[in-house]
Structure formats: C-alpha cells, structure tokens
C-alpha cells in the first residue's frame, strides 16, 4: 500500500466493478469453450464454482478437448493455480482479515482481485477492492 490520501470508497468500487465486469465476460467464453470441449452443463458449472482461476479452467478444458489424459489435464490446471497461493501470502498480510473469514476469501485470490487490491492506498480501500472484485467475478 502506498502512503497518501485515502481513495474514496466509490472510486474503489468503480474500479473493482470495471475489472470484474470486463474479466467476467471471459466466463461466457469459458462456457462456450467448455461446451465445445464436450463437458456438460453441470460439469461446466461445477468447474466454475470450484476452480475459480480462469487460466486453470481453460487449460483443463483445452487439454480434455484435445483428447488429453484427464489426470494430466487436472495436474496442469492445478499447477497453473498454484501461483495464487503466492498472491495469498501477500494479500493475507495486506487485508488482515479475521481468521474465520480467510478460508472463504482464499477462493477469491486470483490475478484480478490481487491487482485491484494492491492498487489501493489504504487497508480499507484494499478490502473494498478485493471484496467487490471477488463478488463481481464469482
């Protein structure tokens, strides 16, 4: 967090919504790709719910659509998602969320929520940015 004047909450919400809506459109592309790759509606929805990082979702579906081994596809998706653990280490300190909330917040630790959070000048703004981006994308 940079030192300086606090950013108005409305500006943080605006920025977070902008990122969330723009990136959220890739969810539509994922649905189309998933359907084209042979996954059913329930499988696609479960994948979106449980594997929140888009890169991992697209990697898994792409590998399966190309006839890849499901275990290999899952391993590739897993390793793409591991980078989020490193984001989580930084965000944990920055957001300083209560312990009871952290497991739920961990689901939202992705590139976009990290970028919006780190761009904020105060802890309050960082929490708002993280939450609004996470809600918008989830």
Predicted feature locations:
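Transmembrane alpha-helix boundary and packing residues in multipass membrane permease domains
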Residues: 31-32, 61, 89
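Short, Lys/Arg-rich, polar N-terminal cytosolic tail immediately upstream
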Residues: 1-11
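Membrane-interfacial helix-loop connectors
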Residues: 35-37, 42-83, 95
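Helix-loop-helix junctions within the multi-pass membrane cores of secondary transporters/permeases
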Residues: 3-4, 74-138
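Small-residue-rich segments of transmembrane alpha-helices in multi-pass membrane proteins
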Residues: 23, 52-56, 106-110
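The first (N-terminal) embedded transmembrane alpha-helix
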Residues: 18-30, 51-53
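Residue-level signal for short hydrophobic patches within transmembrane helices
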Residues: 10-21, 46
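Selected transmembrane alpha-helices and immediately adjacent juxtamembrane segments
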Residues: 17, 32, 36, 135-138
């Amino acid at each position: 967090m940079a030192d300086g004047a606090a950013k108005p909450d409305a500006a943080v919400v605006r920025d977070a919504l902008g990122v969330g809506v723009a990136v959220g459109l890739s969810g539509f592309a994922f649905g189309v790709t998933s359907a084209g790759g042979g996954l059913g509606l329930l499988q696609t929805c479960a994948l979106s719910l449980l594997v929140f990082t888009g890169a991992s979702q697209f990697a898994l579906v792409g590998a399966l659509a190309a006839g890849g081994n499901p275990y290999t596809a899952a391993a590739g998706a897993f390793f793409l998602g591991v980078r989020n653990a490193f984001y989580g280490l930084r965000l944990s300190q920055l957001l300083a969320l209560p312990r009871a909330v952290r497991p739920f917040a961990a689901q939202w630790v992705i590139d976009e929520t990290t970028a919006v959070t780190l761009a904020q000048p105060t802890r309050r703004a960082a929490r708002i940015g993280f939450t609004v981006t996470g809600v918008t994308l989830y």
